[in-house]
From Swiss-Prot:
Keywords: Cytoplasm, Magnesium, Metal-binding, Nucleotidyltransferase, RNA-binding, Transferase
Source species: Karelsulcia muelleri (strain GWSS)
Stated family: Belongs to the polyribonucleotide nucleotidyltransferase family.
Role noted for this protein: Involved in mRNA degradation. Catalyzes the phosphorolysis of single-stranded polyribonucleotides processively in the 3'- to 5'-direction.
Reaction(s) catalysed (UniProt annotation): RNA(n+1) + phosphate = RNA(n) + a ribonucleoside 5'-diphosphate
InterPro entries: ExoRNase_PH_dom1, ExoRNase_PH_dom2, ExoRNase_PH_dom2_sf, KH_dom, KH_dom_type_1, KH_dom_type_1_sf, NA-bd_OB-fold, PNPase
Name of the protein in its database record: Polyribonucleotide nucleotidyltransferase
The UniProt record lists the keyword Metal-binding: yes
PANTHER family: POLYRIBONUCLEOTIDE NUCLEOTIDYLTRANSFERASE, POLYRIBONUCLEOTIDE NUCLEOTIDYLTRANSFERASE 1, MITOCHONDRIAL
S1 motif domain segment(s): 648-715
């Protein structure tokens, strides 16, 4: 059967074209689509299982995103020449697409859904992650699955106050090398035609108004892409009425319930047994662990009750109904009494305490505790040898700052099998890293590790606060302290009411409809990530949340500064000191010496580590050492080697040898020249007034290109009368 290509085109303001295609590739999938922009091409497929999975409490959705090395014209490095496990950038894109699509599936979907996105071709002028949401939405929209889409994403950056949609890696890189290019925003926005679903990115202390301006700008392009998807769907002659791949929860109950009892009876029965007790527990302002234990005991009692009454209902069904009742009770307390589970009002921040220098053996450390969430961050300083090298299908780069986030199971009082770094840990670590990367200097390679020791919500934001304090404790001169806060949205679906919560608890996140993580300094935002469970939020809700977060951020910063008001004046005594300076490229060989002997001698004698590299026609010298005195000696030695005299400048020179035709003098340790007899004085005798070891003044006249020697003069410093009088 000959493939039938169906295609839709649209154009950006700058004239670039974007196309959406279906019908030609991957026809065995329930839905497939290709998006092309420039030479960047992405293929997305969606496959739905024929049988439902009845043991899930959530939508069994799996997103897989892979960037093939062939897309960028590369072969994988290493011994195995094929793509392996996904790298961090791929995992971050998987999480991004998941957050975009998951809210738009029905809650009672129990058929497995697998969406696979592949980068087939890569163009340096178009980054693929901004198109991943578009191609995935198109594939799902033309499949049989019931989906409240279409949706789309765009990447938007701002350089010199000008917005660019779906930029390339070169545009972002240029801002790092050219001072006149100021990239202060890099954002991915996702949404439906009327609402925003996804906001994620980093900023350089921009205002809340500028943030909303970028979101509104991006949403206009999202709407264009949604129109293109709708047009593509209507062109698809084979597009059939969507089938609802799901298992109706209530119908499922009927199969297991005797005596013609229905699910409403069961729900009312569970309410009768537990409602007042649960309500009392949630109003008692208990600690999370104690509250969870009491709730768990109630659940066990309910299961035991149904078992004794011989009502055939499985534990999963009880769990789902019990969760619904818990959510209903918590929402009632919030909306009717404006009191939260820990007794706070809607705007209150939990109690904060912090400490620094808690681990004396590391370069910098801090513990940040907010309520029942606690993070321990450590800072390790290194050199350019310790950079995090990124070499994947589309990018080759070096990170001088990187942050690793660990979320061990004991932080929530659980036992779990440790299987390496989870996707969640990678995502939270990346968010904290983006929050801090633009406020630290680039002299050092900096590795921050954050271990969550206790968690009851907002652990990634606690990581940002702890890491800021740890950086300040290490002596790194941060531009300004950064704090983080999680903002929540709770909707009442019956009345349409909505409330915004500051500093989310874990249970509030679980029952809520939005978790909006925002980080920033007193001057503006540095990073954000929005995760919602509903089909979108309006500009008004988004704007109100962002402006409300500012108040919380400033409060947290004020609390942090009571622990450490400014960065330490010097690096920790255990930290390696680094000194970086530039030399002319042609003098690199002089520093290294014959066979590397000179640089090795300096390193051994001063107990330092010296790294030399070329950059922009200069030699970059990086000297590392723990002893400040020896480090200064190494610096002095290299500066002596690379000493370049200035024409017309007078220097003190030491006489090394005397000849009839002049004297050999040294104006630095490694720079020697001949002071000819005719340049010594207006007299003809030398020995009568100059001896070996004398220190005399000489004027540097430049180089003798013929003999490749330096030219020096003594007599040009003074007048003839002065010399005759003083040198006789």
């Amino acid at each position: 059967m000959i493939p039938e290509l169906i295609k839709e085109n649209l154009f950006l303001e700058d004239g670039r074209a974007l196309s959406i295609e279906t019908g030609e590739l991957a026809r065995k999938a329930n839905g497939s689509a290709v998006v092309r922009m420039g030479n960047t091409s992405l293929l997305a497929t969606v496959v739905i299982s024929k049988e439902s999975k009845e043991d899930f409490k959530f939508i069994p959705l799996t997103i897989d995103y892979r960037e093939k090395y062939s897309a960028g014209g590369k072969i994988p490095g290493g011994y195995i020449k094929r793509e392996g496990r996904p790298y961090d950038e791929e995992i971050l894109t998987m999480r991004l697409v998941d957050r975009l699509l998951r809210p738009l599936f029905k809650d009672n979907y129990y058929n497995e859904i697998q969406i696979m996105i592949s980068l087939l071709s890569y163009d340096i002028n178009v980054l693929p992650d901004g198109l991943a949401g578009l191609v995935a939405s198109t594939a799902v929209s033309i499949s049989e699955i019931s989906f409240q889409g279409p949706v789309s994403t765009v990447r938007i950056i701002r350089i010199n106050d000008a917005f660019i949609i779906n930029p390339g890696i070169e545009e972002i890189k240029k801002s790092d090398f050219y001072l006149d290019l100021d990239l202060d925003l890099d954002l991915i926005v996702g949404g439906t035609n009327n609402y925003i679903i996804l906001v994620e990115g980093e900023m350089r202390e921009i205002s809340e108004i500028e943030m909303m301006e970028a979101i509104v700008k991006a949403h206009k392009y999202i709407q264009l892409q949604i129109e293109a998807q709708i047009s593509l769907i209507t062109k698809n002659k084979k597009f059939i009425k969507k089938k609802l791949y799901k298992i109706e929860l209530y119908n499922y109950y009927y199969k297991y319930i005797n005596f013609n009892l229905n699910v409403f009876y069961i729900k009312e029965k569970i309410k009768f047994i537990s409602y007042e007790e649960i309500d009392y527990i949630y109003k008692s302002c208990l600690f999370k662990q104690k509250r969870s234990n009491k709730i768990y005991n109630i659940l066990k009692k309910i299961k035991f009750h149904f078992y004794n009454e011989s009502i055939v209902i499985n534990n999963l069904e009880i769990d789902i109904i019990f969760d619904e009742i818990k959510k209903e009770i918590i929402k009632n307390i919030l909306f009717k009494e404006n009191i939260r589970l820990d007794g706070r009002s809607l705007d209150d921040i939990r109690n904060i305490c912090s400490q620094v220098d808690c681990l004396p053996g590391v370069h910098g450390s801090a513990i940040f505790t907010r309520g029942e969430t606690q993070a321990l961050s450590t800072v390790t300083l290194g050199s350019s040898l310790d950079v995090n090298k990124i070499d994947n299908a589309i990018m080759r780069a070096k990170q001088r700052f990187y942050l690793h986030y660990n979320f061990p199971p004991f932080s929530t009082g659980e036992i779990k099998l440790l299987k390496g770094v989870s996707r969640r840990e990678i995502g939270h670590g990346n968010l904290a890293q983006r929050a801090l990367k633009n406020i630290i200097p680039t002299t050092y390679t900096i590795r921050v590790v954050s271990d969550v020791l206790e968690s009851n919500g907002s652990s990634s934001m606690a990581t940002v606060c702890a890491s800021t304090l740890a950086l300040m404790d290490s002596g790194i001169i941060v531009k300004r302290p950064v704090s983080g806060i999680s903002m929540g949205l709770i909707m009442n679906y019956l009345t349409g009411e909505a409330i915004i919560l500051s500093d989310l608890l874990g249970d509030e996140d679980y029952i809520g409809d939005m978790d909006f993580k925002i980080t920033g300094t007193e001057y503006g935002m540095t990073a954000c990530q929005m995760d919602i469970k509903i089909s979108g939020i309006t500009y008004d809700v988004l704007s109100y949340t962002i402006f409300k977060a500012k108040k919380g951020l400033l409060f947290i910063i004020k609390k942090m500064l009571t622990t450490l008001s400014c960065p330490r004046k010097s690096l920790n005594i255990t930290a390696t000191k680094i000194y970086t300076f530039y030399i002319p490229k042609k003098l690199i060989g002089a520093v290294i010496g014959s066979g590397g002997k000179r640089i090795q001698e300096i390193q051994v004698s001063t107990e330092t580590n010296i790294k030399i590299k070329e950059k922009n026609y200069l030699g970059v010298i990086e000297i590392l050492g723990k002893n400040e005195t020896k480090l200064k000696i190494a610096i002095l030695k290299i500066k002596n080697i690379t000493f370049v005299p200035k024409v017309g400048t007078i220097y003190k020179a030491k006489v090394k040898n005397i000849k009839k035709f002049g004297v050999f003098v040294k104006i630095s340790k490694y720079l020697e020249g001949l002071l000819h007899i005719y340049e010594i004085s207006w007299l003809t005798k030398v020995e009568s007034f100059i001896r070996k070891g004398d220190i005399i003044s000489v004027k540097y006249l430049g180089k003798n290109n013929k003999f490749r020697k330096i030219k020096l003069s003594h007599k040009m410093i003074f007048s003839r009368y002065y010399l005759n009088k003083n040198l006789k």
